[in-house]
From Swiss-Prot:
PANTHER family: ALPHA-INTERFERON-RELATED, TYPE I INTERFERON. Induction: Transcribed constitutively. Not induces by viral infection. It comes from Mus musculus (Mouse). Glycans are attached at N94, N101. The gene is Ifna13. It is found in: Secreted. SUPFAM superfamilies: 4-helical cytokines (SSF47266). SMART domains: IFabd. This is Interferon alpha-13.
Amino acid sequence: MARPCAFLMVLVVLSYWSACSLGCDLPQTHNLRNKRALTLLEQMRRLSPLSCLKDRKDFGFPQEKVDAQQIKKAQAIPFVHELTQQILTLFTSNDSSAAWNATLLDSFCNDLHQQLNDLKACLMQQVGVQEFPLTQEDSLLAVRKYFHSITVYLREKKHSPCAWEVVRAEVQRTLSSSANLLARLSKEE
């Protein structure tokens, strides 16, 4: 009789923990991986940003989606997942591999892939728990438009070293913003 009771108690504790943390340890592992990805991005820099000032561009990062005070963690996870997926897609393109040190690029992409796995675990916990709000759909569309403008920019600049440096710096800001969003939300829990 003690074993079934203990088993039930474990299930109750685990389900409570899942409900409170969205079923994953995202704030700790994701934050550490994000910091490592930011460090790798910094190490990937090949040119001084000052030498590429003429190539700078505002890609229209959806900052209002990150700054929104009313955003909940459940809404932030799909947003950060889409950001991470788009960054990984950008840096695994054939044109990207020619622009960076292969070892650093592989490590960076591996970190992004691990972050995506963490985020997917959270998304799976959310499936069926909540509906997909229209504002969330708008956020994902804004992210896709943002990365489309980056892709178009790289094409227009013929994937030049300066264009990639501008994009690297932009992605660094984007990753930093997503990390700050998740850190803020984890403090609110």
